Amino acid sequence: MSLNKTIYEGKAKAIIETEDSSTVIQHFKDDVTAFNKEKYEIIESKGIINNHISAFIMEKLEKAEISTHFIKTLNEREQLVKKLKIIPLEVVVRNVAAGSFCKRFNIKEGERLASPIIDFFYKNDDLADPMVSENHILYFDWLSSKEMDEVKTTTLKINEILVHLFSNASIYLVDLKLEFGRLINDSTKIVLADEISPDNCRLWDKNTYKKLDKDVFRLNLGDLKEAYLEVAKRLSVKLG
């Protein structure tokens, strides 16, 4: 890890300062957690795999004119990214019923949704990331009405691009979790933050429905590293 000061450390990544006040280093760790940290393990090289997969996807999104915080890959574990003020929301877009969505509505896992569904969650570990409505978001001033429309439009565009990308790799994009932030030097500009990797996407093999994401760890379904390497291989992501 860089010798510079760590200004934030989360469950799977650390954010490290740089000499430029408008950028930070995003460091990918090998830690993997589930059920709000109740389940925890260190899986060798997981951070390396996610770093490369996320960089690959962020570059694809930038080419599709999606604004992201990604600038460049620095090394096997780190990226240079734009410094943001993170909006405290997790934006989940669902294409297939899975996970908490099935429990909430008593729907069978695997049911295809007629169109993508967006859910918002307040990003707060102490409260276990509760689901929130658009009215909550407006009330707490996390987003304006115009910004919310922008985030939803961008989320659906990202989803469309990634559904196609993963489909070409014989993978279903079941759902994904996105985070957004405001540029530190231009608070009117909202961009995609965080990462896009098997840590925050549900990915199923199109033929066997085998899980290729963090559910492998959550549900004790096998070797997480092997699943993540399979995703990288199918996307033709070079790992070094």
Curated annotation (Swiss-Prot):
Pathway: Purine metabolism; IMP biosynthesis via de novo pathway; 5-amino-1-(5-phospho-D-ribosyl)imidazole-4-carboxamide from 5-amino-1-(5-phospho-D-ribosyl)imidazole-4-carboxylate: step 1/2
CDD domains with a match to the protein in the record: SAICAR_synt_PurC
Keyword list, A-Z: ATP-binding, Ligase, Nucleotide-binding, Purine biosynthesis
InterPro entries named in the record: SAICAR_synt/ADE2_N, SAICAR_synt_PurC, SAICAR_synth, SAICAR_synthetase, SAICAR_synthetase_CS
GO BP, sorted A to Z: 'de novo' IMP biosynthetic process; cobalamin biosynthetic process
Keyword presence, Lipid metabolism: no
Keyword Kinase: no
Any single GO CC term annotated in Swiss-Prot or TrEMBL for this entry: cytosol
Recorded catalytic activity of this chain's protein: 5-amino-1-(5-phospho-D-ribosyl)imidazole-4-carboxylate + L-aspartate + ATP = (2S)-2-[5-amino-1-(5-phospho-beta-D-ribosyl)imidazole-4-carboxamido]succinate + ADP + phosphate + 2 H(+)
Molecular function terms, GO-annotated: ATP binding; phosphoribosylaminoimidazolesuccinocarboxamide synthase activity
Domain of life from the UniProt record: Bacteria
Class in the EC hierarchy, top level: ligase
Pfam families given in the database record: SAICAR_synt
Covalent S-S links between cysteines: none
This enzyme's EC code(s): 6.3.2.6
Family (UniProt): Belongs to the SAICAR synthetase family.
Protein name according to UniProt: Phosphoribosylaminoimidazole-succinocarboxamide synthase
Record lineage: Bacteria, Pseudomonadati, Pseudomonadota, Alphaproteobacteria, Rickettsiales
